[in-house]
């Protein structure tokens, strides 16, 4: 939409695609003969978000943990390199976008623009404004007011489940399989954060 070259002003109508809700994911799993209880369904959302393309990659013969291993942890798994591939396909120079997300992944309550700009890899100015706007428009982050930390001050928070999962467990990889992470301190920390994101993305339903 903001392209300055040949495609500028040639958009007839923007379409804002949003991830599936938990209910829609449940319908998709049923269509694909994927058997899960509600707890597993929520955890699958905590990992993959409501992205139907990712959910269609599930193998019905495997458990949720086995699907996570096959798709994300195997060297040639379909989603092993998805985190980097996604952002390099979306943005010409995604390095600062990635730096913003990786910093926000460390702060579940969010950070102000000023706090983000103090990071050497992020910086400030109009570039930060543009990058934050692009990430918000794509649904990776949200901007909100947190009146418990300062009246009227705007905060930015990571709200994309797959991005959080990828940063915590794929980019900063400590183990070779999802099974090794389960019940580790890092797993429980992520689980609390990811569950909050799922709830936040389902406020109308809740």
Predicted region positions:
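Short regulatory helix/loop adjacent to the ATP-binding pocket of P-loop NTPases
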Residues: 1-12
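Short aromatic/basic micro-patch
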Residues: 19, 49, 157
